[in-house]
Amino acid sequence: DEDFAATSDATFSYCPADRIESLPNGDIDLAVNVASMQEMTLAAVAGYFKLLRKRRTRIFYCCNRLEKRLSGGELLRFMDYPWLTADVHLVDEACPWHQWFFGRSRAPRVRVGGVAIPLVHRYDGVHWHRLTRLAQGS
C-alpha cells in the first residue's frame, strides 16, 4: 500500500523495512525496532542507522538477537551494529520480555520448577535490548 507512512503532521508512522527511505521528512522523536534488524544484512542495518542519525532521531529502542547467522551465511551481531561511542545507552541488557514465544514448535520449552510449560518455547538465541539516545553524526 502506498499510504503506509503517515502524513508529515502525524504523531506515529509505521514503516516496513523496504520503504524506510519513504518516511516523511523531519526529525524522529522515537524509533523502535524489534526482532527485524536480526533478519537484515549488516549493510542494511547500517543504512537504517545512517537514516536515523540523518533524521536526528532522539531516542532509538532496539531489541534483536545478540547473534544470528543469516540464510546467506553472514553472521550478524547486535554489538557490531553501527553504534557510536558518543551514543548514550539508557538501557543496555538482555531483554526480559523477549526471550520466549507462544506456539507449537520443536524449540526448547520454558520450564518452571522443572516442569515444561505447554506451548511456551525459548528462542534459540538471547535477545538484547537498548534504549539509546543516538549521537548525531555518521
List PLM regions with ranges.
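S-adenosyl-L-methionine
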Residues: D1-P24
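Rossmann-like AdoMet/SAM-dependent catalytic core
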Residues: A17-I20, L75, D80-S138
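Flexible loop/turn segments at secondary-structure boundaries
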Residues: E21-S22, E39-M40, K68-S71
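Short, conserved loop/helix-junction motifs that constitute active-site signature segments
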Residues: G26, L51-R56
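A conserved beta-strand element that flanks and buttresses the S-adenosyl-L-methionine
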Residues: V32
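Short catalytic micro-motifs in class I SAM-dependent methyltransferases
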Residues: A35-S36
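A short, conserved alpha-helix within the catalytic core of class I
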Residues: E39-L52
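Conserved beta-strand signature within the Rossmann-like core of class I S-adenosyl-L-methionine
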Residues: R56-K68
